[in-house]
């Protein structure tokens, strides 16, 4: 066992393993989103956020906000970065609250509803930037994209939530 010499904190294998796992998962989330970028408003991030919340509980913040940091580093500061600071947390809390649910249809509905409400969740930042009129007009004009987001999230979660949950649960127990 490493001795604490005062200038460093020894980490056991579990801590190093968690740091590595969360780094890989955050980077994978970023890469998977951009691998699917050719499909408008269809992304796996919502699925990953739900999975991280269910598998890792409070520690889900690490891969989720690593993903947000990668967005910021690669694409610069934009309003979406501000929104991402709380939007993914909303979904993570909802998923954590539903963690006992086994039915993939339930997870698909949660993910689909999140996609449908994505524009509404963005509205507080839009109100701060341009006022209520701006936020409402932006939300309404984005409804077709939110519908696409809803459908994509629903299908992705319905097909992939159960097998990926089993995989992450297994990784978390090792």
Region annotations inferred by a language model:
Residues 2-9, 18-25, 67, 83-128:
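Short helix-perturbing small/polar motifs within transmembrane alpha-helices
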Residues 30-43, 66-101, 128-132:
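Interfacial aromatic-anchored transmembrane helix boundaries in multi-pass membrane proteins
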Residues 54-57, 94-102, 162-169:
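Structural signal for the C-terminal ends of transmembrane alpha-helices
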Residues 2-51, 55, 59-63:
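Hydrophobic transmembrane alpha-helices
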């Amino acid at each position: 066992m490493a001795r604490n010499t005062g200038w460093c904190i020894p980490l056991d294998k579990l801590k190093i393993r968690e740091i590595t796992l969360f780094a890989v998962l955050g980077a994978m989330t970023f890469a998977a989103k951009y691998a699917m970028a050719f499909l408008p408003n269809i992304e796996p991030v919502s699925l990953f956020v739900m999975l991280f919340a269910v598998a890792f509980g409070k520690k889900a913040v690490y891969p989720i906000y690593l993903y947000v940091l990668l967005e910021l580093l690669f694409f610069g500061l934009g309003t979406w970065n501000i929104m991402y600071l709380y939007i993914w947390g909303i979904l993570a809390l909802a998923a954590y609250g539903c963690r006992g649910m086994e039915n993939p249809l339930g997870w698909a509905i949660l993910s689909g509803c999140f996609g449908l409400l994505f524009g509404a969740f963005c509205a507080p930042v839009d109100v701060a930037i341009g006022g209520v009129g701006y936020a409402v007009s932006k939300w309404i004009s984005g409804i077709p994209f939110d519908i696409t987001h809803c459908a994509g999230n629903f299908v992705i979660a319905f097909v992939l939530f159960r097998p990926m949950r089993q995989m992450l649960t297994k990784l978390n127990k090792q």
